[in-house]
């Protein structure tokens, strides 16, 4: 069930410096708005050669109205000319679980890889067409070429969800 399903149209201000801070902000916001337990996600892409950028600005890296293609193009321009070993990146997901009267629980999942030199594939969203998981050779398949099932086994969100499961069952 989402906040939209409950008729809540306000969004929290995601001004935290980290994925964890923003996930906590969203979970606390949902808990306070509904009084119900809330599970929130904050995710993004970190590129080593860019000191972790785009990071918490992943969705709006090329500007507030930027499309996925705009964000991908900006990132590819910034990494132009770098060899595969300097294009290391990771997707990060932090899940935050907020329950009434309890501390917020967070779990982090990552998926390591590298940024391709050009987009390949149209599946997924965001940076998927330019993200090569670590198990792929340079020039191999990007997440844009993975099936939902394949991506679901190794994605940062899947890993965070597996780590959160015990807290959800408690």
Specify the residue positions occupied by each region the protein language model found.
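Anionic-ligand binding patches
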Residues: 1-170
């Amino acid at each position: 069930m989402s906040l939209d399903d409950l008729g809540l149209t306000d969004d929290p201000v995601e001004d935290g410096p980290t994925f964890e801070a923003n996930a906590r902000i969203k979970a606390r916001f949902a808990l306070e708005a509904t009084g119900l337990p809330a599970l929130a996600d904050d995710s993004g892409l970190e590129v080593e050669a860019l000191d972790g950028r785009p990071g918490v600005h992943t969705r709006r890296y090329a500007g507030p109205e930027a499309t996925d293609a705009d964000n991908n193009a900006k990132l590819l321009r910034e990494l132009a000319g770098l060899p595969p070993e300097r294009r290391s990146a990771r997707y990060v997901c932090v899940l935050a679980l907020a329950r009434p009267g309890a501390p917020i629980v967070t779990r982090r999942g990552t998926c390591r890889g590298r940024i391709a030199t050009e987009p390949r594939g149209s599946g997924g969203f965001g940076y998927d067409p330019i993200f090569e998981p670590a198990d792929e050779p340079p020039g191999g398949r990007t997440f844009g070429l993975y099936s939902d099932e394949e991506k679901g086994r190794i994605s940062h969100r899947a890993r965070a969800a597996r780590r959160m499961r015990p807290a959800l069952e408690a």
